[in-house]
Amino acid sequence: MSRHVAIVTDSTAYLPPQTMERHGITAVPLTVVLGDQALEEGTEISARSLALALQKRRSVTTSRPSPDVFAATYRAVAEAGATGIVSLHLSSELSGTYDAAVLAAKEAPVPVRVVDTGMVAMALGFCALAAAEAGEAGGGLDEAVAAAGKRAAGTSAFFYVDTLDYLRRGGRIGAAQALLGSALAVKPILRLEDGRIEMLEKVRTASKAIARLEEIVAAQAGTGAVDIAVHHLAAPEGAERLAERLRGRIPGLVDLHVSEVGAVIGAHTGPGLLGAVVAPR
């Protein structure tokens, strides 16, 4: 298995650790700022701790990795034997992570191709896996970037949140959309579109919204070979129920991942998040 092309992503890809290890993928952590503490996602703050902080209405913000952190990562990967790096990151509409990676790539000891996938969570994770598999098959930088781009182009992400307040506070959704949702007391279904979070539908109750989310995901999956990821924050039972229902509805299902999002995404969605990523093969 070739490691000449190394894959770097960020902590919002939420890839299982064993999957990252198997494919040699490195994740650069984003930071959650809880009060006056800056904590690395994945190692210094858990999703559960984040959910508790949000429920207590503590001040929570997030920040990108610095260019210096990316530069150190690129050097370490090159020293481990990589002759080129594909660095795949969450949407630049949602974070400055891509910009930090671009700055660091200019000083890297080996060629680095930095890609704004326009994705987040396992929508980003599936892109990183596609790039890694292209490298393992003997492809170079161009092939790995193309594989990630192809996966991103076909991938969709949908999610339900209990309230739009967290997205509004973090500037990830327009104030007008958030105000409309709150004023009408509706439950929003959102989607990732062109790298931005957009309102897809407004439903009257949580149960109807989750049922509608299931319908949307099943329709998007179609009948061909497809991977699905179900994400949640502090809603494990709801995530398992959604996953089980999708298993019975999607004939071409290959892999189904169920996981809790990390603290960075959780900070902007709040507890009760249920989401699904649809990634055709």
Model-derived features with residue positions:
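Glycine-rich phosphate/diphosphate-binding loops that line cofactor/substrate pockets in enzymes
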Residues: 1, 72-83, 216-225
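Mixed-charge interfacial surface used for oligomerization/domain docking
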Residues: 3-6, 12-26, 30-33, 97-113, ...
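N-terminal glycine-rich anion-binding loop in soluble enzyme alpha/beta folds
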Residues: 5-71
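A general structural signal for short secondary-structure boundary/capping elements
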Residues: 52-57, 74, 133-134, 277
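Glycine-rich phosphate- or other oxyanion-binding loops that anchor nucleotides, phosphorylated ligands
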Residues: 56-103, 141, 145, 152-155
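Short catalytic-loop micro-motif centered on adjacent basic/acidic residues
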Residues: 61, 87, 114, 229-230
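Short beta->alpha junction loops
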Residues: 64-65, 116-118
